[in-house]
Design a protein with these regions (language model features):
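Short, structured segments at the rim of ligand-binding sites
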Residues: 1-423
Length: 423
């Protein structure tokens, strides 16, 4: 699907969609129980559908009533080697490898888009020496398929910390279910620590005990059972970051449903925008970011890489030079987001460059627009383009807009409600 985005002024109040990262985790905890759990504030997306399919393959069932999702946990006997369609969701894929080994003795995980090319060697190197059979192939329809067969055993597990925290979270879900005690150690430095904390918070709410013995080292008792824990899903700082950056660029937007008490690493968007010179007003779970005299800054993306593209746009329109550091993991997302961000900004008339794992931006006063952007197949690039267009002299065109369905299907409706123009 192709859309043209036009220069516009955005104004209004928006409720942040439910946190995708939190929803993944709460759904999995609910699916691993034997009871019923209600999650309120739930929002559909392609990634949520992927996690629901995988839980369904393990015997969970779902009922949707408005924004309430009722999950009935694993029922009956689990099929041997269930097939799990992960869509394009990296979280779903990496969470369910150890879960499936633990509760089903293996699985066939189907992957679409670029998901089949995203790194999985951390698990392969961990599980194959422990007797798990591992095979990467291609299905009859051309989709990548990962087949894992075997059983996880209690023991001492060590993971490198300079990889996606999704591998750590996958083990945290599975290890408590094993018939014996285990330890999990993550070697420092650790990527996206906040997402590990979010997983621990979710499993603890479901009655799982995890004992932290040292920094990034946990003792995990076995023979545990997940207990039903209904909750309301918090708003998503990762999605709200797009609107907060729009505020920093001169639009008048208030975002609601954003708790100041959160393990979401992408709350760092507020700190980073203030470092660029924006003003942040926060009260009663409402956030309004106002433009100031934006200036260059060095911003560390180590714990919040997903907000780097929209921050790069904001920094591009600030005075002076900015540097976004530790952006290397952007290369391993739905597209090479580091290269795509630099390409988009330059095509629009900015001055951006990649410097190793950093993005360097030389501020410009105005973006030209007037171009057709490539189809990146990435929801973050769609959001970036839509906000960039509001600050361009000429409209911009982009194909592949349907990629937005992966995380926030209602985004374009929200964008237009705020005054955004696209057709």
């Amino acid at each position: 699907m192709k859309k043209t985005f036009f220069p516009a002024h955005l104004i209004g109040t928006v409720s942040a969609p439910a946190s995708k990262s939190e929803a993944h985790r709460r759904m999995i905890c609910a699916g691993l129980t034997k009871g019923e759990t209600m999650l309120t504030g739930f929002m559909d997306s392609a990634d949520m559908a992927a996690t629901m399919r995988c839980l369904g393959a393990l015997g969970s069932t779902f009922n949707r009533d408005g924004d309430t999702l009722t999950i009935s946990g694993m029922q009956g006997k689990i099929a041997k080697m269930p097939v799990m369609d992960c869509g394009e969701s990296g979280s779903t894929l990496r969470f369910f490898v150890p879960i499936a080994l633990t509760v089903a003795g293996g699985t066939v995980l189907r992957m679409h888009g670029r998901l089949g090319s995203r790194p999985m060697d951390v698990y392969r190197d961990l599980f194959v020496p422990r007797g798990v059979r591992w095979y990467m192939g291609v299905g009859a329809d051309g989709a990548a398929e990962l087949t894992v067969r075997g059983k996880m055993e209690p023991g001492d597990y060590v993971l490198p910390g300079d990889v996606s925290s999704q591998f750590v979270s996958g083990l945290l879900f599975a290890l408590p279910l094993l018939p014996g005690n285990s330890t999990l150690t993550v070697q420092q430095p650790v990527e996206s620590e906040s997402y590990i904390r979010m997983t621990i918070e979710a499993i603890a709410a479901s009655g799982i005990e995890v004992q932290e013995s040292n920094a990034f080292s946990w003792r995990i008792p076995g023979h545990q059972q997940y207990k039903s824990h209904s909750c309301h899903l918090n708003g998503d700082y990762s999605q709200a970051a797009v609107l907060c950056c729009a505020g920093a660029l001169g639009h008048d937007i208030t975002v609601t449903h954003l708790s100041s008490v959160t393990t979401q690493g992408d709350r760092a968007i507020l700190r980073h925008l203030m470092a660029l010179g924006a003003t942040v007003e926060e009260s009663d779970n409402h956030i309004r970011v106002k433009a100031g005299k934006l200036h260059g800054a060095t911003l560390d993306m180590h714990d919040c890489p997903d907000i780097a593209p929209i921050l790069a746009l904001t920094a591009q329109l600030a005075e002076g030079e900015s540097r976004l550091t530790h952006c290397g993991r952007l290369r391993l997302k739905e597209c090479d987001r580091l290269a795509a961000t630099v390409e988009i900004l330059n095509l629009l008339g900015g001055n951006a460059q990649a410097d190793g794992d950093d993005i360097v931006l030389h501020g410009v006063k105005q973006l030209r627009g007037g171009v057709t952007l490539p189809n990146y197949g990435d929801h973050r690039m769609v959001m970036l383009a839509s906000i960039a267009a509001t600050k361009c002299e000429q409209p911009i065109e982009m194909d592949g807009i349907e990629a937005i369905d992966k995380s926030w299907p209602e985004y374009l409706k929200v964008y237009q409600m705020l005054g955004g123009k696209c057709e």
